[in-house]
Amino acid sequence: LFQDVKTAACRAALESPTLSGHCAGMDVHPAIRHAPDPDHPGWWSWDFADDGKFHAVVGKLLVRADGPGRATCRMFPEERHSNLGDMIHGGAILTFIDMALFAGGRLAGANVIRAVTLDLSTRFLSRGRIGVPLDAEVELLRETKRLAFFAGRVVQEGALIAHFTGALRKASTDS
């Protein structure tokens, strides 16, 4: 079920104007619905079949491959994501970044669907507004047999909200 993305095929897909930057035929995960989003051209859904899990707190999540080793994830902050100052709660942004490591990491070419977060370091630089899409730009820095390393930034309408680095540890195939 969890096959590596073919780099050459992914690059060809990224260069295809008809695929809107998505790696066609990519194995994602059977529990994730991944299809073009009709309301957001060029973006693909990243919806979980089981809405009873923690990831449902983020709400609608979209993804877009931006080139080899790069992807962008988008969330739509709602009132339920706000803090007492009516801005996006830092915990909501951290949850979004964690999910972006997996979704964006997968579209960036990393085989990280069966992985756990090993490290996530985030620096908040500005506040995020409710009702305005929030993007996490993810870059795959390095991938080994057991680890994947990322860096990225969270932006809202071009303004830098946060930057982050993270590492995911892939599940062992021995057990």
Where are these regions (language model features)?
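Terminal targeting signals and extreme-terminal segments of soluble enzymes
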Residues: 10, 16-175
